[in-house]
């Protein structure tokens, strides 16, 4: 059975998709209006999310409770006219499954009890059987996809190897990546060993999400922007490129979005991958990104490299815009969409925030954002 036949067989388990606007935009097909969703759209800005999380007890218990993970995924779709759902989970599920002891402290974000700081730590990391150690994620994907009943497509996701490695080595969030960058310059082979292990796990993890029901995949390279140019190529992009290439072998029909926060400088590098779309944060104008990607395609052709398909764009409203008035939000959305379609394009774009929606946003302002996107005339 070919990969395409296998994907078609998997789809028979679920209701037909009713709203494929986002998928059509990623394929550069005609769309009636701009598709939109929000990173972290199931989150703490919603009172119903807070209530469900309180019932679960803590964040990871919520992630591992199939019924509640399904519920919080669906909550924003009940409020808003969104064009996609995204699995409710966390980017740190892989290192948690590797035994690093993920926990959360109030006001301090995620932490690991057992950070990776020496070769013995690295050698102890298991080769994951994702369908065993992360079976709760796959159960949630299937449950959510079934509950959606074809309403909108479902995103699965993972953190990138580089981003996961920073958390695993630092033991949590970091402002300067002291230990991770220390290895990068003093013992790069150690870091490459870890990134290689993580890339293998990310491939298997995202593959399993597709089998469970995910229709689109996103790789969150949240801290790729902390790297220098050459370091980004070697320690982030190379592994992301490998992951996407293998996913395209296994599931050629599944779109993959690659989002590197702070990665606008490296769109030409990311163009040399099989990702269907690149996510932008708010620091890179969309019209300029389109121009960079068009020129990158020309250069790749001249260099006789494999010419990957044109890249759609996703993004990139500053999340802080949602603190503004409805009039301000609409004006900023219109400016963003003017930029997205400035060069005469009519598709190949998905509206989103430039990073996750924050817990302090008024839910009514999120609706203003979503409705303003749909109201814009392409």
Swiss-Prot record:
Reactions that this protein is recorded to catalyse: uroporphyrinogen III + 4 H(+) = coproporphyrinogen III + 4 CO2
Binding site for substrate: 40-44, 90, 167, 222, 355
Keyword flag Heme: no
A GO MF label: uroporphyrinogen decarboxylase activity
PROSITE patterns named among the record's database cross-references: UROD_1 (PS00906), UROD_2 (PS00907)
Classification via Gene3D superfamilies: 3.20.20.210
Cellular location(s): Cytoplasm
Pfam families: URO-D (PF01208)
Site (Transition state stabilizer): 90
EC number, as in UniProt: 4.1.1.37
CDD domains: URO-D (cd00717)
Record keywords: Cytoplasm, Decarboxylase, Lyase, Porphyrin biosynthesis
Signal peptide span: none
Cellular component, GO annotation: cytosol
GO BP of this protein: protoporphyrinogen IX biosynthetic process from glutamate
Presence of the UniProt keyword Lyase in the record: yes
Pathway entry: Porphyrin-containing compound metabolism; protoporphyrin-IX biosynthesis; coproporphyrinogen-III from 5-aminolevulinate: step 4/4
Task of the protein: Catalyzes the decarboxylation of four acetate groups of uroporphyrinogen-III to yield coproporphyrinogen-III.
Family according to the record: Belongs to the uroporphyrinogen decarboxylase family.
Subunit details: Homodimer.
Name of the featured protein: Uroporphyrinogen decarboxylase
Organism: Psychrobacter arcticus (strain DSM 17307 / VKM B-2377 / 273-4)
